[in-house]
Design a protein with these regions (language model features):
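Sec-dependent bacterial lipoprotein signal peptides
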Residues: 1-20
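Short coil/turn linking the two alpha-helices of tandem helical-hairpin repeats
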Residues: 123, 144-153, 194, 216-225, ...
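An aromatic- and glycine-enriched ligand-binding surface/loop that stacks and positions planar moieties
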Residues: 21-81, 176, 184-185, 204-207, ...
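C-terminal substrate/ligand-recognition segments
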Residues: 351-475
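Long, intrinsically disordered, low-complexity segments
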Residues: 19-20, 74-77, 92-95, 105-106, ...
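Conserved, well-structured interaction surfaces
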Residues: 39, 43-57, 78-149, 164-177, ...
Length: 582
């Protein structure tokens, strides 16, 4: 399902989603002379503000995968990569991936500023809905900048020449306060119609992101906040999350896997609207109308790069699969917050684990091996051709179980499984692509389940104590996952409920690019990763991937709580200073 924003053709593809740089085309590409002679041209200009989301530099790879994916539950499986320096903690101020992400965020801001300046005085947006979207996106880009670089230049006018690029940094807290204030102003005129959701921003999208912004501002990662401000921000986060809940416009899809199958197949859920906002991507670049900039699902999918000459026969599209879970995520599913009875019944498995950490990939080695068929029984064994069929995890010589099982077997790679949440299986993607790293899987930016979790967390922090009502907000997530929950009395203290929510966020939202920023706002990003290295390389987590985690964390320090300001930016904007952590 496509909206006008996703059907970029000709000019807009080349301009926004291709390899060219907006500033390389023309210093002031969005002008009154170029656009704004019709409502359709104004819409195209607004597309230019949205289009940055769909770039390789943001949600196609750099921002979400390269620079911010590693955490205590997700790890980069290698230790070095020339094009993934962020994932291997080898970046510095000269790194191109850092520069490109910084630049494209400011492109989005520049496009928004130009749009807001040029739409003024026209009658193409009589209700102010387009202006509200542009203002929200500009605020969102500033929120991302302040999260990643702390103190950043706050530009509210389009740069009309290369002579006025000098601008000092604004403190992080002020940038985030500006972002929150702008988003709040958007609520007055932005549409509450979900017709074009989750591609377009709507009122509940803004409310949900406001909950995220205020929750982040209330945490430990933002410099300069007082205790009184933190308390206020927790309250505002709860208020905005509550508004989404009380709107009645969003529900949990009863099938957890279907939420992501929709994204894989480029389908919008028009029944439940659990996915509230997505970054849309088109495809594998096999044709001009199937041109995309995303490696989402390819870099963080089930590995299928051992293709050989039989790629056309494979039941999956191409994926390098460079990220896996850690042992901590496995144990969060299998042990933490599980009832005693279900811990002893290995057949009772969290459905989120089944979908996210499947016991197979598509990268088998060797010519042929006898295995059980997927979902079949041992009496119907057949030959598996490596790479074409699912390649199960098992220890050499061990009895191979049904490949759809996720029973707790320590020999079944519990801490080194590829991410299955955005798998590129043909049955879900809807087509067999040519052998390409590019794909059209959409990236979730906000889900209703996240709103529920933010509400429960913010209220616990604001009140200093949980309640059974907050506990009941979380229960539907676990009921959908098919697991039982201990009674409220087990989580009735502030500390226990806080940890329960933190664990539940990992189980529900893993591999969606949120965990690092959760750890940052809790003030435990570096510590949580380095503490986990004591487990790596031993016991049930003794794979080479686990040993790589030790190497990655040896490069980790407090400076990795943020990114360095690019050297090229510092050379041009001489009023800007390098981040103090770098």
């Amino acid at each position: 399902m496509k909206t006008i924003r996703k059907i970029f053709t000709g000019f807009s593809v080349a301009l926004l989603l291709g390899g060219c740089n907006l500033l390389d085309v023309k210093p002031n590409i969005i002008t009154e002379e170029t656009f704004y002679t019709s409502s359709s041209q104004a819409q195209l200009a607004l597309n230019g503000v949205y289009g940055v989301l769909n770039s390789w530099q943001l949600y196609g790879c750099n921002l979400i995968l390269d620079l911010n994916y590693n955490s205590d539950i997700v790890q980069y499986m290698s230790t070095t990569n020339a094009t993934m320096k962020g994932a291997s903690f080898e970046i510095d101020a000269n790194s191109d991936d850092v520069y490109q992400t910084w630049t494209w965020l400011y492109k989005g801001i520049r496009n928004a500023n130009a749009f807001l300046e040029n739409i003024e005085g026209t009658d193409f947006d009589p209700e102010g809905k387009m202006v509200a979207q542009a203002r929200f996106l500009r605020a969102y880009y500033y929120f991302i900048l302040a999260q990643n670089w702390i103190n950043v230049p706050l530009r509210l006018k389009a740069i009309d020449s290369y002579s006025n690029v000098k601008c000092p940094a604004t403190p992080q807290l002020q940038v985030m306060q500006f972002a929150a204030s702008e988003m709040e102003k958007c609520l007055e005129t932005i549409t509450d119609d979900l017709t074009f959701a989750p591609s377009d921003v709507t009122k509940t999208t803004v409310e949900g992101i406001l909950a995220r912004v205020y929750l982040y501002m209330a945490g430990e990662a933002v410099e300069g906040t007082t205790a009184e401000q933190k308390h206020e921000y927790f309250g505002k986060a709860a208020d905005y999350a509550r508004m989404v809940i009380e709107s009645g416009k969003h529900q949990l899809n009863p099938d957890y896997a279907q939420v992501f199958i929709n994204m894989i197949g480029d389908k919008y859920d028009k029944e439940y609207y659990e996915s509230m906002w997505e970054a849309d991507f088109l495809g594998d670049r096999s044709s001009p109308d199937y041109y995309g900039n995303s490696r989402w699902g390819e870099l963080n999918g089930l590995r299928s790069s051992n293709c050989g000459t039989n790629f056309s026969e494979m039941n999956t599209n191409f994926a390098y699969g460079l990220f896996s879970n850690t042992i901590k995520l496995w144990e969060l599913y299998m042990d933490d917050d599980r009832t005693k009875l279900e811990k002893n019944l290995s057949v009772v498995t969290d459905k989120r684990q089944q979908w996210t950490l499947p016991p197979y990939h598509y990268n088998g080695t060797g010519e042929e091996s006898w295995v059980y068929p997927y979902g079949g029984d041992p009496s119907d064994a057949r030959k598996l051709i490596a790479g074409i069929d699912k390649t199960p995890y098992y220890t050499s010589g061990a009895e191979l179980k049904d490949r759809n099982s996720t029973n707790k077997e320590e020999t079944y790679y519990p801490g080194s499984r590829y991410c299955g949440k955005f798998r590129r299986e043909v049955q879900y993607e809807g087509r067999k692509n040519f052998k390409s790293i590019w794909c059209g899987i959409n990236v979730p930016l906000l889900r209703y389940s996240d709103v529920l979790l933010m509400y429960a967390e913010a209220m616990n922090e604001y009140m200093g104590t949980p309640s059974e009502d907050l506990y009941n907000v979380i229960l539907p997530l676990r009921e959908r996952a098919g697991i039982s929950t201990e009674p409220y009395s087990k989580y009735a203290s502030y500390e226990k409920f806080q940890q329960f929510i933190r664990n539940e966020r990992a189980r529900e939202l893993c591999f969606e690019g949120l965990r690092k920023f959760d750890l940052l706002r809790w003030g435990i990003y570096v510590k949580s990763m380095q503490d986990l290295t004591t487990r790596a390389g031993t016991g049930t987590w003794s794979t080479s991937t686990a040993r790589n985690y030790i190497i990655l964390c040896s490069r980790l320090s407090e400076k990795n709580n943020c990114l360095p300001i690019p050297s090229l930016e510092l050379a041009v904007n001489t009023e800007l200073k390098q981040n103090h952590l770098w």
